[in-house]
């Protein structure tokens, strides 16, 4: 039996998953980090020590382990010296100290840039740590650092991680970073996710007492890994993840030319556009206790569809599927607790439908089914409400998480010949939800909701 290992380095901890070549999980282990505040910076050596601890505690024997890949946060960057040692903590994706540099890059290089991206963090580091900057030999992403620890090869990254460091995914080349005073020689070689990098470092395999012919392959960002694990791997397939926010990701033949999307490069040559709303599921934990959710879901199951409207945005500003910097919560004080809960579930469904209508118009392709993931999948009535509002099938895979996405990438060029073949053999659909009789009613309610939203926002341009 051939085995595959996926490693996910998250913000709060690491998770390792071992599967067989059919996607069955044989073992998984995790460790939490103990940072006081890891949102701005983290010590990457802590990541590695946590992974080593996990590797030493895996119960399943690794004798038949064929390949390993890694996924981690998108936009996190680490400066290394010539000895491959960090000369500073990892600058995390959630570090927004480089907002000024992001604006400078946009003006100078004419490319879209945000403070959450890694390229402005590099420029910020140069501007604020002059002496340390002189010692930089290479910039590596979080994924690259762990792969370097596994192999001794640090200066290779993948398409998905390189995107936010200034890599042009259309031309497969670095943009001219010399325009902002950075040295391209410090930037890594870029390869497809799943590309063979090296066999495991012999010293590491001896230390762990595992075989030394394990292939380590290029990884990918956690968002892309989760997308693949959710099932959206092939052309015109889309995933929708509702956690704190609503995130849509898909696979298209051509890049989507719209400022509210950014696009990764798919391992098989397609593009992977994504968009993220500020609406999601955060309002549930803000407004309700966990011990209330069973009763609230029971109410929603019994009384949907409703004709109550709210807009459950907890922050100011919306970015997708429409841009409105002044958007804010629109509440309805006349609703009781249960009614407001149901109205919130439906509101997110309406925004999700608006987003997919925008995607269908921009791509010219009809989307028949949607793969879903995130905390929202725990609510059965919400899944049914979303399916009926969208008027599309919703599919849930067995293991829709980033670590399993790393497993799929690890298998895609070692055990199998492509990501598509890997999907056919390793991804299992756990549940399919179809629109029910409420779908007809929801189509009319959706139109009413958009009209209501436009009136309350004093906007007439929400629909493209």
PLM segments and residue spans:
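Active-site core segments that coordinate phosphate-bearing ligands/cofactors
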Residues: 5-6, 99, 103-114, 123-141, ...
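A conserved helix-loop-beta module that forms one wall/lid of the active-site cleft
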Residues: 179-195
């Amino acid at each position: 039996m051939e085995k595959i290992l996926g490693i996910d380095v998250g913000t709060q901890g690491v998770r390792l998953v071992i599967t067989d070549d059919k996607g069955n999980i044989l073992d998984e282990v995790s460790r939490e980090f103990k940072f006081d505040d890891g949102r701005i910076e983290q010590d990457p050596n802590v990541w590695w020590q946590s992974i080593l601890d996990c590797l030493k505690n895996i119960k399943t024997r690794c004798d038949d382990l064929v390949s390993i890949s890694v996924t981690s946060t998108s936009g996190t960057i680490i400066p290394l010296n010539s000895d491959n040692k960090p000369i500073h903590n990892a600058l995390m994706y959630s570090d927004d100290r480089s907002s000024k540099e992001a604006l400078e890059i946009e003006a100078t290089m004419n490319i879209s840039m945000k403070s959450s991206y890694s390229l402005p963090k590099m420029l910020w580091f140069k501007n604020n740590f002059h002496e340390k900057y002189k010692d930089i030999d290479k910039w590596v992403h979080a994924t690259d650092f762990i792969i370097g620890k596994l192999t001794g090869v640090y200066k290779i990254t993948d398409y998905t991680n390189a995107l936010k460091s200034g890599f042009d995914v259309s031309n497969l080349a670095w943009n001219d970073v010399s325009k902002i005073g950075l040295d391209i020689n410090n930037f890594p070689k870029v390869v497809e996710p799943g590309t063979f990098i090296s066999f495991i470092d012999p010293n590491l395999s001896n230390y762990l007492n595992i075989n030394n012919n394990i292939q380590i392959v290029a990884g990918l960002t956690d968002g892309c890994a989760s997308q693949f694990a959710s099932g959206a791997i092939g052309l015109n397939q889309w995933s929708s993840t509702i956690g704190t926010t609503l995130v849509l990701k898909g696979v298209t033949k051509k890049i989507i030319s719209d400022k509210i999307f950014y696009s990764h490069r798919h391992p098989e040559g397609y593009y992977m556009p994504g968009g993220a709303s500020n609406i999601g599921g955060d309002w549930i934990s803000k407004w309700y206790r966990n011990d209330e959710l069973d009763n609230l879901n029971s109410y929603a199951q019994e009384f949907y569809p409703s004709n109550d409207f709210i807009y459950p945005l907890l922050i100011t500003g919306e970015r997708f599927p429409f841009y409105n910097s002044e958007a804010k919560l629109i509440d309805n004080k006349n609703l009781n607790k249960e009614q407001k809960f149901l109205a919130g579930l439906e509101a997110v469904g309406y925004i999700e439908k608006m987003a997919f209508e925008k995607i269908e118009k921009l791509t010219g392709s009809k989307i028949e089914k949607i793969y879903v993931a995130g905390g929202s999948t725990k609510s059965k009535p919400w899944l049914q409400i979303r399916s009926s509002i969208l008027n599309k099938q919703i599919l849930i895979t067995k293991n829709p998480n980033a670590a399993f996405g790393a497993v799929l990438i690890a298998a895609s060029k070692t055990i199998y010949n492509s990501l598509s073949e890997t999907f056919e053999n390793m991804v299992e659909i756990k549940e399919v939800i179809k629109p029910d009789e409420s779908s007809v009613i929801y189509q009319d309610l959706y139109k009413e909701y958009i009209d209501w939203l436009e009136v309350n926002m004093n906007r007439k341009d929400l629909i493209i």
